[in-house]
């Protein structure tokens, strides 16, 4: 099987004999039931391929769709004028880049259709004029497809890049790009009667930055149950298209076919984009894993978006204060250019996803989607938060290996050494509430990374919960941590709260570990096992 890794052109996939997961039934539904759409999905999730497929569909290239669902659904196969703008691949941190790109696109289209341009008009006005001209000349309404509509904004989000406009005014490029896009998108309102179909894709839905205020509000299908699987790969699609490839991967890795399916699911599945909660696999990582026949962090290795790194560096919110909570959609769907509210950007960038839906309150539980994101994203955050030379993921590997050998002494030494390596400037907290917050967040980061290697939970008991319970094939480890307390206090709590009771019938030995953490030294100062 040939995997279309890095190929986003539908025609190239078909002509090259690459595997294609058929999404054309959803595309047909989209083009027959609506007119102007917006779709938000994380990077490398198939948005560009979706746009490309629509381009060839509206181009009337029926032969490319032989054997696909849409071949039987579509009867007409009409050809429409298609205007495709792809903002991928351009750097919009320079003041003139966006305007120049739009000017070049419109000028090329004017030449293509034999229309004389008018430099006195804005680029949005010229585009609206062009759409009307092409509609009248061809007798066909126009199709506009814009891929990564928000990249000119994300490139300069939360920066102070500046430029001088034509009137000599000194402007932030973020503001300039926003105004330029607003003016360009206003063409859609002026040309409504000339439009057959419009799709804008991107990572982020900008709410109060006025990008969409200039034209008819698009139908946002980002959380639509009908379109939740329009990008990405479902479990049914994985089994139906890649069954033999998963078996071959299992053979290569020396595990059973069922084990390889569980590995793929834990590492790349877990995305949900609607209240229906259909499991969606990350397509980029999944295809890479099947091609290479190995489990690696393919999506995360392509890099965390710079805009998200900037945003996180400027916020005081810790991830443990954002995850595991129920939210109204207004809290995580619309980004309002507020660095104090990073949740929408983290969610829309693919680092958090929907894990549950509460119908009574119409709210959504958000958390990390899968092990790839847990390990990569939390390691990145831990590096910035703790400032250690050794990564938190390296520590997690050491802790995992120690517990699998039932070696608590090495476990303690590794954890103690890691805490000792945290610079004083990173852990210095003056207020008691700050000390508590630092203590809880540090352990949250370490143990959630550890959970990608071992069965690790914060077990809810009727009497309360242990700080952490780790299960290995040969043992159960119940940890209780105290800040500026004693290890005896921690062990006493384990007994009094009955944290070990669920394991009374377990054949594995149960280890109770009390740990005291010193806010003064920033490391472990008392440790006892029972």
Label each PLM-derived region with a short phrase.
Residues 459-461, 468-472, 503:
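C-terminal amphipathic alpha-helical interaction region
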Residues 443, 466-483, 497:
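Conserved catalytic cores of phosphodiester-cleaving nucleases, focusing on short active-site segments
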Residues 143, 475-477, 511:
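Structural motif
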Residues 502, 506-530:
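Domain-level recognition of nuclease-like catalytic cores that cleave nucleotide substrates
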Residues 184-191, 344-352, 441-449, 493-513:
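Metal-dependent nuclease catalytic cores in nucleic-acid-processing enzymes
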